[in-house]
Swiss-Prot record:
Pfam families: Complex1_49kDa (PF00346)
Catalytic activity: a plastoquinone + NADH + (n+1) H(+)(in) = a plastoquinol + NAD(+) + n H(+)(out); a plastoquinone + NADPH + (n+1) H(+)(in) = a plastoquinol + NADP(+) + n H(+)(out)
Entry function: NDH shuttles electrons from NAD(P)H:plastoquinone, via FMN and iron-sulfur (Fe-S) centers, to quinones in the photosynthetic chain and possibly in a chloroplast respiratory chain. The immediate electron acceptor for the enzyme in this species is believed to be plastoquinone. Couples the redox reaction to proton translocation, and thus conserves the redox energy in a proton gradient.
Localization: Plastid, Chloroplast thylakoid membrane
GO aspect biological process, one term: photosynthesis, light reaction
Species: Agrostis stolonifera
Keyword Repeat: no
EC primary class: translocase
Name of the featured protein: NAD(P)H-quinone oxidoreductase subunit H, chloroplastic
Membrane topology designation: Peripheral membrane protein
Alphabetized UniProt keyword annotations: Chloroplast, Membrane, NAD, NADP, Plastid, Plastoquinone, Quinone, Thylakoid, Translocase, Transport
Family: Belongs to the complex I 49 kDa subunit family.
Length: 393
């Protein structure tokens, strides 16, 4: 029996949405020639919940608890962009103490997000030990979140004009203790992972993106900075009080999966530097702009009137959005998270467009995996760092 020298037939494989290594409910239709990837088609929408349309039928204050369900591993950033949009639209000033508290919470959330990227990414490559280490550090961050906000996840902590509550007594000391401890942990990660020959074999030169391609595809965050583009919104378009701290933009020029790993690990160290400076310099004063309470237009209920007797639920505060439009953005762990807001002199936004970094960054995946091996798909997908909650919205 003579065998053909080359196979003419191609195999089509579904990866996900229930694949054990898949990052959320993402489905990839992969065309294979043996182990070689010929084509890859991402299928999205399994986690679509209509978040933009929900926003257009709620007041900002009613909508605030929803936004933590976009990127549920970096919830402080979704809260920040949601309150920043009406603050910029109505020119609301933030107390300095509230701005410092926001920066501390944002950078802790960035570290937590990068940690939960690192653990599963290493597990996808076959290294199980870091997966357990990162949860050890992440729990310490969640302890800090719980002490300050009352919630380990889905914090609902940011408010228009400030934050919901001041930092509790002793919280800053605990935060500084964590910073000292975590800096040693980052060194441990790098000793354990960065020079590992098996790890380098899996990531070095895999998923290359040039600087020009990164810009043309609209990539942002570590995906962009790993390709030699020094673009970080905290530097180029400062918000909150980031311009008052001394820190450096972390970037690499190689553009492969290893470079994206190095950028994220280095960013965790820079986040610690920002947190340490913020907690040492944090000023006194109010944690919210009390003038913002002017938007609470609901009248006070009188003793024994109709509302007092029959309406158990109090009306939520209203915040009227003037007839303007603007785009606001923050540097989230995965890239540029933006909101395009259009107001029309009503309580509800006329348009609330979300610019999710994961959705934009995912578009380049088919180009990266073509002509690669099947096993490289999970390496490349893991290096992109997506959360399907913000991809599908």
């Amino acid at each position: 029996m003579s065998l053909p020298l080359t196979r003419k037939d191609l195999m089509i494989v579904n990866m996900g949405p229930q694949h054990p290594s898949m990052h959320g409910v993402l489905r990839l239709i992969v065309t294979l020639d043996g182990e070689d990837v010929i084509d890859c088609e991402p299928i999205l929408g399994y986690l679509h919940r209509g978040m933009e349309k929900i926003a257009e039928n709620r007041t900002i204050i009613q909508y605030l608890p929803y936004v933590t369900r976009w990127d549920y591993l970096a919830t402080m950033f979704t809260e920040a962009i949601t309150v920043n949009a009406p603050e910029f639209l109505e020119n609301i000033q933030i107390p300095q103490r509230a701005s410092y508290i926001r920066v501390i919470m944002l950078e802790l959330s960035r570290i937590a997000s990068h940690l939960l990227w690192l653990g599963p990414f290493m597990a996808d490559l076959g290294a199980q030990t870091p997966f357990f280490y990162i949860f050890r550090e992440r729990e310490l961050i969640y302890d800090l979140f719980e002490a300050a906000t009352g919630m380990r996840m889905m914090h609902n902590y940011f408010r228009i004009g400030g934050v919901a509550a001041d930092l509790p007594y002793g919280w800053i000391d605990k935060c500084l203790d964590f910073c000292d401890y975590f800096l040693r942990g980052v060194v441990e990660y790098q000793q354990l992972i960065t020079q590992n020959p098996i790890f380098l074999e899996r990531v070095e030169g895999v998923g290359f993106i040039s600087g020009e391609e990164a810009v043309n595809w609209g990539l942002s965050g570590p995906m962009l900075r790993a390709s030699g583009i020094q673009w970080d919104l905290r530097k180029v378009d400062p918000y909150e009080c980031y311009n008052q701290f001394d820190w450096k933009v972390q970037w690499q020029k190689e553009g492969d999966s290893l470079a994206r790993y190095l950028v994220r690990v280095s960013e965790m160290r820079e986040s610690i530097k920002i947190i340490q400076q913020a907690v040492e310099k944090i000023p006194g004063g109010p944690y919210e702009n009390l003038e913002v309470r002017r938007f609470k237009k609901a009248k006070n209920s009188e003793w024994n009137d109709f509302e007092y007797r029959f309406l158990g639920k109090k009306p939520s505060p209203n915040f009227e959005l003037s007839k303007q439009e603007l785009y606001v953005r923050v540097e989230a762990p995965k890239g540029e998270l933006g909101i395009y807001l259009v107001g029309d002199d009503s309580l509800f936004p006329w348009r609330w467009k979300i610019r999710p970094p994961g959705f934009i960054n995912l578009q380049i995946l088919p180009q990266l995996v073509k002509k690669m091996k099947l096993a490289d798909i999970m390496t490349i997908l893991g290096s992109i760092d997506i959360i399907m909650g913000e991809v599908d919205r």
